[in-house]
Amino acid sequence: MNNTMTSSQPYTLTQLGWKPFFQQQLTLEDYENTQICRIVAHHRSGYQLCSEQGRFHLAIHHAQPKMTVGDWVLLDEQQQFKRLLERQSELSRKAAGSKIAEQLIATNVDTLFIVCSLNDDFNLSRIERYLSIAKEAHIEPVVVLTKADLSPQAEQNITQVQQLSATLWVEAVNALDPASVSALQPWCTKGRTVAFIGSSGVGKSTLTNTLLGEETQQTGGIREDDSKGRHTTTARSVHMIPDGALIIDTPGMRELQLADCSEGVSETFAEIETLAQHCRFKDCQHQQEPGCAVQQAINNGTLEARRLQNYFKLQREQAYNASTFAEQRNRMKQFGKMCRHVQSDKQKLKTTY
């Protein structure tokens, strides 16, 4: 088995992560006249697809829907794009910078490994941000903490992450040690799709290489003076580990703004929303209002002030971006209507003359 999935060898649909959810979307005609493929790499020039018939390149075309690594697509007999199958899960973020757009990260993921190093990169608020994205996508999150040997506060930091949620899986590993990384094996069984997400240089590619048992992704060290990664993954790709799971290694993300993520934020900060139900006033802003159950929890030490402030921040961010996306979609809809009217008027003029 070629772990990097770069050869032209065929894979069974089960190996590629095929599930009943996708099978239910196919007709008899689809089975007879199309090839079922999964996108295993996404580059500027196009997509790399794997199927039971082998490996294919699919050029990006403006008429295609937006697609990314993890998507299932159907190709016709000429190996041309025919249809994108409905996604079981979808990881996305607001595109970096001021651009008003939602960027796909990966799709059809079963487990999201949220990777954070226990050196200067350690940041609980960033972990909560990733958890919100995972929960919005209905993907099981697992927090993977690396570089424990670089921090004298490693044990304290691990406990802090575990306290974010009683049901949250947290694993501290040495990314270079196969025995240590084997703690992730329960989520890496045959046919499952997992993805790594985290800042640049936290060890995502190193973890991938250790699971694969080979140097597949280019990696670089972290400078001790500023803890910044020097070499990072630049394109999304899928790899198959010996145990049979598919791993999506995403580029490091210097900026990760939430898109429409209200459900994810609510689930990540569930205890705050539960406390809010006990406030004296229904419109309580959890600031200085009398009878605020949230502020009372902060005062008695059962809720961290940092966590409340991050909840406020993520709520504002996702609400703003969601409304911005909605406005953009409405403008595009109106523009589409105008174009159709113009085409209709032109057709009428041709008919008249």
Swiss-Prot record:
It is an enzyme of class 3 (hydrolase). It comes from the Bacteria. GO terms for molecular function: GTP binding; GTPase activity; metal ion binding; rRNA binding. Keywords: Cytoplasm, GTP-binding, Hydrolase, Metal-binding, Nucleotide-binding, Ribosome biogenesis, RNA-binding, rRNA-binding, Zinc. Its cofactor is Zn(2+). Zn(2+) binds at C279, C284, H286, C292. Binds 1 zinc ion per subunit. Its EC number is 3.6.1.-. InterPro entries: G_CP_dom, P-loop_NTPase, Ribosome_biogen_GTPase_RsgA, RsgA_GTPase_dom. GO terms for cellular component: cytoplasm. GTP binds at T146, K147, A148, D149, G198, S199, S200, G201, V202, G203, K204, S205, T206. Residues 101-256 form the CP-type G domain. It is found in: Cytoplasm. Gene3D superfamilies: P-loop containing nucleotide triphosphate hydrolases (3.40.50.300), Probable gtpase engc, domain 3 (1.10.40.50). One of several proteins that assist in the late maturation steps of the functional core of the 30S ribosomal subunit. Helps release RbfA from mature subunits. May play a role in the assembly of ribosomal proteins into the subunit. Circularly permuted GTPase that catalyzes slow GTP hydrolysis, GTPase activity is stimulated by the 30S ribosomal subunit. HAMAP family: GTPase_RsgA. Monomer. Associates with 30S ribosomal subunit, binds 16S rRNA. NCBIfam families: ribosome small subunit-dependent GTPase A. Belongs to the TRAFAC class YlqF/YawG GTPase family. RsgA subfamily. This is Small ribosomal subunit biogenesis GTPase RsgA 2. It comes from Vibrio vulnificus (strain YJ016). The gene is rsgA2.
